[in-house]
């Protein structure tokens, strides 16, 4: 393979590793992801149980095109059909005119709410079947000075109740009877609740309740230009929302009828004023005609004059009819509209015909002219008068039988199901949200806090790796016992080197033992210090098992627990903590008798002793140096377990007495920056760290080999 090909392959492999690492990181944190998702799902389930359900009621109304107006129907029948003005009607339904009457009719400005525990109280009441308890208040007023006070109604039983406020007001009332005290008036029509149940009574402004109705009311047209409107109203009370929607449709219908009736009423008032005047003019015309006939001795008209007279009277009648039509059509159209222009053209034609007839009358003898004029005035007046009488009767009938343009097709009905919350959707959405957030959290944590993922990552920065110890499944199982059955039992359990000597982690520690044999050849003494980067990385585990493995080679090993704050090696090895390191350094114990034998041959332990107030000062004493010198002369290896260097300075103090120093870092937990900072602290104190032990390497979901560790198992045959 050429160099260029190798580089290309390396880049490709690196890209694949990056993608695989992301997937692997999520898979490794699967229990955390699943746990987080389960919490989100549980919260969603709890919410759906306790959230207040919202119901929906719907109704259907139809806008009939110009119902009840024959004139407009006649006009529109001659024109193209004009679609109903649905948009205008929708705004009318949502107007304060309609909704305000609904608020007044149903006393919606008075709200009575049952007092429950915040957040979950209402849901609990529903689960217990007590959510239908109610108090019906039809009247509630209070002085302006009490507008900011909170009024509470307490059910006393026997149809009695007590009304109190946080301002000191208190009064008792009886159902069905008005309560009046200090300017506060209330009338309770019904109570359906247990004694001692409390309700909050609130008074809202009419405008505020209208706005609330507008927010919960939806009006849409069904289809295009159908004139059929669908009304939907949402709320918490199934019965109340049905009543509200029925009231809205009823008030909408009534206002439409009232508007039509008002129009007819105004026309009737106008006719009532005009009829006497028309009758008076008719009487005058009749008197003049009679007087002229008496004066001329009953002059008869010839047939030609009679025909002209009839034509003129007929034209006058038609002109009067057009006047009525123009009054109606002017409300709908401008003069530029085709229908209006047609009417004006017809009027002009009649007026032209009338002018011609007037010319023929002018050619007649004077007596005939006068008789024609007087007779025309009488007959035209009679026709006008009869038309007005007919119109009056017609308007009276219209006023009495007005149905309006609106028809309620479907009265309001509450849908059986719950509109919201949609339980399945909320739970599913919460599961998806929890899954996404947990995965993002895992990836962000991995991105911003990337632990050491391979020995090569350390070696590339010039840091020697003496051993890579895999995570022991056996030890992991013992750790679970710690969680379930308590720390004490866990700490008194067997070492991995004793309980499962063929474990891969012990094999790695044996490899470390071999490496230490050569690493300590040039050391100034046989003292080996093991420290850690940070707490909870398995330093004591490595130290204790390393001591056990070395002691199995028939070398005498002494383990000194220098973690006088949190050391627990004595519990791990099953020895007591009497006359430990702190006691020796404080002068309370003898160095010669401080080492305690363990259950493992050639393996002795000096426990931490009682927790002192000044562990760092004790380690700096000359007596600690004497202890190290004594131990070095009597044992093949002195192993010192110290606290993590990033936590306290004890390791820097002890390191001056050790010929060899190794540092433990945990795989995928400690970062490269932490390791470098720890090494820098040792350098500042003149201590050379030989190398790092990478502990608890586990098989990642992206493949174990990507991190420089190959798993083999080699066991003896059992026969």
UniProtKB/Swiss-Prot annotation:
Keywords: ATP-binding, Cell inner membrane, Cell membrane, Exopolysaccharide synthesis, Kinase, Membrane, Nucleotide-binding, Phosphoprotein, Transferase, Transmembrane, Transmembrane helix, Tyrosine-protein kinase. It is an enzyme of class 2 (transferase). It is found in: Cell inner membrane. Dephosphorylated and activated by wzb. It catalyses: L-tyrosyl-[protein] + ATP = O-phospho-L-tyrosyl-[protein] + ADP + H(+). Residues 52-423 are periplasmic. One of its GO terms (cellular component) is plasma membrane. Its EC number is 2.7.10.-. Residues 1-30, 445-719 are cytoplasmic. Belongs to the etk/wzc family. Required for the extracellular polysaccharide colanic acid synthesis. The autophosphorylated form is inactive. Probably involved in the export of colanic acid from the cell to medium. This is Tyrosine-protein kinase wzc. It comes from Salmonella typhimurium (strain LT2 / SGSC1412 / ATCC 700720).
């Amino acid at each position: 393979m050429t160099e260029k090909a190798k580089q290309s392959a390396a880049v490709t492999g690196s890209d694949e590793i990056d993608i695989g690492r992301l997937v692997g990181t999520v898979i490794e944190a699967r229990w955390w992801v699943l746990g987080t998702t389960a919490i989100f799902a549980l919260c969603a389930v709890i919410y759906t149980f306790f959230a207040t359900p919202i119901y929906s009621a719907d109704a259907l109304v139809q806008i009939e095109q110009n119902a009840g107006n024959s004139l407009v129907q006649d006009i529109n029948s001659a024109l193209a059909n004009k679609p109903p003005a649905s948009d205008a009607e929708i705004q009318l339904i949502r107007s304060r005119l309609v909704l305000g009457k609904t608020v007044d009719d149903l006393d919606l400005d008075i709200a009575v709410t049952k007092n429950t525990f915040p957040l979950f109280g209402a849901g609990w009441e529903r689960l217990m079947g007590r959510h239908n308890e109610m108090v019906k208040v039809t009247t509630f007023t209070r002085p302006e000075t009490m507008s900011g006070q909170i009024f509470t109604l307490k059910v006393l039983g026997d149809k009695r109740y007590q009304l109190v406020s946080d301002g000191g007001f208190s009064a008792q009332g009886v159902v069905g009877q008005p309560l009046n005290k200090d300017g506060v008036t209330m009338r309770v029509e019904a109570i359906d609740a247990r004694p001692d149940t409390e309700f909050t009574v609130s008074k809202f402004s009419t405008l505020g309740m209208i706005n609330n109705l507008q927010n919960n009311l939806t009006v849409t047209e069904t289809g295009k230009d159908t004139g059929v409107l669908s009304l939907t109203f949402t709320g918490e009370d199934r019965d109340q929302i049905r009543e509200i929607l029925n009231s809205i449709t009823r008030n909408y219908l009534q206002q439409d009828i009232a508007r039509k009736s008002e129009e007819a009423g105004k026309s009737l008032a106008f006719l009532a004023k005009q009829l006497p005047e028309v009758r008076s003019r008719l009487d005058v015309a009749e008197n003049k005609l009679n007087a002229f006939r008496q004066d001329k001795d009953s002059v008869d008209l010839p047939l030609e004059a009679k025909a002209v007279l009839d034509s003129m009277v007929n034209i006058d009648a038609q002109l009067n009819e057009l006047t009525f039509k123009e009054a109606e059509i002017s409300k709908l159209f401008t003069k530029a509209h085709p229908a209006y222009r047609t009417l004006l053209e017809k009027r002009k034609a009649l007026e032209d015909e009338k002018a011609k007839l007037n010319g023929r009358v002018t050619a007649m003898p004077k007596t005939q002219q006068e008789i024609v004029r007087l007779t025309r005035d009488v007959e035209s007046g009679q026709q006008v008068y009869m038309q007005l009488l007919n119109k009056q009767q017609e308007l009276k009938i219209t006023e009495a039988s007005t149905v309006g343009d609106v028809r309620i097709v479907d009265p309001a009905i509450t849908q059986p199901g719950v509109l919201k919350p949609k339980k399945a959707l909320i739970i599913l959405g919460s599961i998806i949200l929890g899954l996404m957030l947990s995965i993002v959290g895992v990836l962000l944590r991995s991105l911003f806090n990337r632990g050491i993922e391979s020995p090569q990552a350390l070696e590339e920065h010039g840091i020697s790796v003496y051993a890579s110890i895999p995570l022991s499944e056996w030890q992991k199982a013992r750790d679970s016992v710690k969680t379930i059955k308590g720390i004490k039992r866990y700490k008194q359990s067997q070492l991995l080197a004793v309980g499962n000597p063929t474990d891969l982690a012990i094999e790695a520690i044996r490899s470390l033992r071999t490496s230490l044999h050569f690493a300590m050849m040039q050391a100034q003494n046989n003292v080996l210090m093991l420290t850690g980067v940070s707490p909870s990385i398995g330093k004591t585990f490595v130290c204790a098992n390393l001591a056990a493995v070395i002691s199995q080679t028939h070398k005498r090993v002494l383990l000194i627990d220098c973690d006088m704050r949190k050391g627990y090696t004595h519990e791990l090895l099953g020895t007591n903590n009497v006359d430990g390191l702190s006691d020796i350094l404080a002068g309370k114990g003898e160095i010669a008798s401080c080492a305690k034998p363990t259950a493992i041959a050639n393996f002795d332990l000096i426990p931490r002793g009682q927790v002192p107030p000044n562990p760092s000062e004790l380690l700096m004493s000359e007596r600690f140096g004497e202890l190290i010198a004594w131990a070095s002369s009597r044992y093949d290896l002195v192993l010192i377990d110290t606290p993590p260097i990033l936590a306290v300075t004890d390791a820097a103090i002890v390191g001056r007495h050790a010929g060899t120093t190794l540092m433990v870092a945990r795989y995928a937990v400690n970062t490269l920056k932490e390791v470098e900072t720890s090494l820098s602290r040792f350098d500042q104190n003149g201590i050379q760290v030989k190398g790092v032990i990478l502990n608890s390497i586990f098989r990642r979901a992206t493949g174990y080999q990507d991190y420089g560790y190959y798993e083999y198992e080699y066991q003896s045959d059992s026969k």
